[in-house]
Amino acid sequence: MLFSKSGRTIFPLLPPYGVQDPNGVQGRVIPVHPDGSTPYLGLRARLSQVWLNRWTVLLLLVLARVLMAASSIKTDMNRAKSEALSACTSVESMGDAMVSMPHYLAEGVNELTADGVNAAIDGLKMLLMLTLTGVEELVIFFVKVMYQTYLCLFTLVVHGVVDVGLSLIEDVTDVLNSTVKTVAKDIAKVTETFEDDYNTLISKINGVASLFGGSVPTLNISSEIDKLENVQLSSSIDKDLQKINDSIPNFNEVMNFTENVIRFPFDEVKKLVNESLGNYTFNASALPVPAKKTLTFCDKNDGINSFFAGATDIILTARKIFIAILVVAAIIACVPMAWQEIRRWHTMKERSQLVRKEAHDPMDVVYIVSRPHTAAIGIKAASRFSNSRRQILVRWVIAYATSPAALFVLLLALAGLLSCLCQFILLSAVKRTVPELSNEVGDFAEEVVDVLQNTSAQWANDANKVIQNVDDELNDHVFGWVNTSTGALNDTLNTFVNKTIGVLNDTFGGTLLYEPLLDVFDCLVGLKVESVQKGLTWVSDHAHIDFPLLPNDTFSRGAEGSLNSSDASESFLADAGDETSNKITEVVYKVISALEKALLIEVIIASCILLVWVINAMFGIIRALTLFWGRDKNRGEGGPAPPNSRPNPGSGPDSHGFIDVPLTSLPSHRDADETAARSQPAPRYEVATSQGSSAAVVSSELEYPDEKVGFAGQRNALRVDGVSDLRGSSYVEYGIEKY
């Protein structure tokens, strides 16, 4: 056998020297094993492990974490369901206590209402007594002011008129008496002369007349003149005026009568008020006491069970969706990975030719072959730079950031974030159903408020009927007397006016002073009395009491207001300090909050893992930047060789699209290298003598920049002497796919 050569006892077995060397044809390799077996995996073997690719495994891990999260959420929701049902029972008990609260509060409220009514009636009694006394004295004072004012004015007018009349009569009498006597004397003198002459004439005439048997009487008017001299006005002419002056009324009788009439109804009303309200006590037992109520909304309403059943259905549906999506994604991921394996296989076969070529860094070749994708990305990024050293640094940074360890950290972080995203979607779907539970609980609260409103309204209606009966009783028995008193007072004032007018009529009736005195009385007294009567009429119309009635929401206003409050902690279904409006949704929010906190921790952990990868990549970037802008070293400092010692890279890429990258231009020390190699305890590949196309280093005007390229490790680890003296491994160059 080919592997029977002595000294080949180490594992794995290596092919004998020279069997893979070309047999006259460049690049032709003879298979080692007749059955075609190779120690590395062929294409079909690689494809058989496609389902174990990293993406499929990561997706399955994400699926496992999502299933665990769904199971955890389901368990937590079941626990929350039990707590919610327990909370519903406690809320129901609280609702029972609240709807029964009017039963316990009614007695106290009834006593408070009775005390309020009693206090109001006591105050009303005092107010009525004071008002009656005040109105009584005010009316009497007003009447006195009116009639005394009128009496003074009346006395002034009458006495003045009578005094003026009497004085005038006396003056007229004196003038008349003196004037009449003087006139009488003068008339007597004139008439005496006339009488003498007339009598003389008559006597002569009688002398002649006697002849005829007749006679003419003589004139004698002295007696009438004497009467005229003795004429004087009678002293009784001023007796009537004096009688009027002495008979001016003082209205004492009218005032006494009026005052007695006014005081009588007031005294009677006071007596009735004292008798009616003196010992009045409102009967608190007449107010109703509501019966106790019981609520059963937890038993009749299946909202909580339906909510958690719906939440469980959402979790199961989401779990099925995630299983389908992630499993399909994991299966679909096998397709590009299979295609990638095929490309990787062919790329690796193509790039394995680099091993047989000289002027390549073996470590770079191994990296390119083993990591084709990251190496291709590095080469693509490095192609943007013309400087070979910078190209190498760019490729190094990408290789540093995409090393197996770094990629493991990166993929672990991405898988964690993807798992968190799936959990967040699942949790958000559950969280969106919480308003449904809040609506159900809101219905509970509204039911409690409705029962409270009905109980409160019924109690208020019954209590208001009792209060209205008290209003009617007081209005009939107390203010009815007030109405009677005001009517009697109006009648009294009318009597006062009529009596006064009667006195005036008796005194001045038929005289010139009667009409003026009536006008003065109407002006001074009548108009004022009319105003007082209008006021008394207004009092009579408005003299009634209306105690304030109890509102229908006496016992339900606070609970109803808590439902409309913007502060959720004010809800009557919440404990003091709760952030939610009720205990039931508080249980669900606690579960969701705990899951959110756990999810946040996972996000932080995944982010920290991603940050580790970022920090690692930054280390590589910083290191590359320090070298990126560094100064080039000369030959003595380990810099590149002179341009004329470089191998000719050729005019372009080969048939596979690769460009030879020169490793070094050091002179060959083949003998020393072989001597050192043979001194090692393990066998090593022998250099195959070949007359390949790359025989010697030829200077060309197409030369690489003067930079150090391709060293990985010791500077003189590899030596190339211008011929293809690197033995290529035949394990990567078989023409057919192997298992």
UniProtKB/Swiss-Prot annotation:
Membrane topology note: Multi-pass membrane protein
Query: What are the GO cellular component annotations?
Result: mating projection tip; plasma membrane
Q: Which residues are sugar-modified? A: 177, 220, 245, 256, 274, 279, 283, 454, 483, 490, 498, 505, 552, 564
Q: Which residues lie on this side of the membrane: Extracellular?
A: 1-49, 170-320, 419-598
Q: Provide the protein's localization.
A: Cell membrane
Which parts of the sequence are annotated with region: Disordered? 636-693
Annotated GO biological processes are: plasma membrane fusion involved in cytogamy
Any idea which UniProt keywords this protein has?
A: Cell membrane, Conjugation, Glycoprotein, Membrane, Transmembrane, Transmembrane helix
**Role of this protein:** Involved in cell fusion during mating by stabilizing the plasma membrane fusion event.
- Similarity comment: family membership: Belongs to the PRM1 family.
Which protein, by its recorded name, is this? Plasma membrane fusion protein prm1
User: What is the originating organism of this protein?
Assistant: Aspergillus niger (strain ATCC MYA-4892 / CBS 513.88 / FGSC A1513)
